[in-house]
């Protein structure tokens, strides 16, 4: 009889896309003593691992403090937000003019008053609203004044910090897209791809892959 082949190959991707790093494969390699370089080179062939400062030194990825944009809401008529801690400036980007300051615990609504004109409205305790300053172009921002500033978006039931909340009018309507701009390292703090109890090398490999993917997508999109 013919001896069985000693090598067995399994193919599959579980519920994922099957491309790139396998988290559980990285965990197994980490438990087996592999370094993060060895883990990465197992899943990505012909690669080098280089710092961003060396490969993108003149790119907006390095020169812009908040080069990454994370979509929060699309095609909404208004956006409700609450300043949970710290303070933030309410600004219109086209005129580079800030109409007021949002204080801790205050609730605001941003939306269109007419075609091409939007306003910040403070929502009072009795549900009435107070317009903050004058109206402006619908490209606007909520800019934190300190590292403690945290902004809550009720529709998403999530809080955001270490970045800038941006509103952008859609080109095809008076409705608004909302994004959160932040730095590469601050973006990585929000990831939870693998538990922190996993081997350090496995976590390091995941961080490098996540950083590389985020930067690649940002470079594809280009600077705003």
Predicted segments with their positions:
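Conserved, single-site charged/polar hotspot
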Residues: 1-224
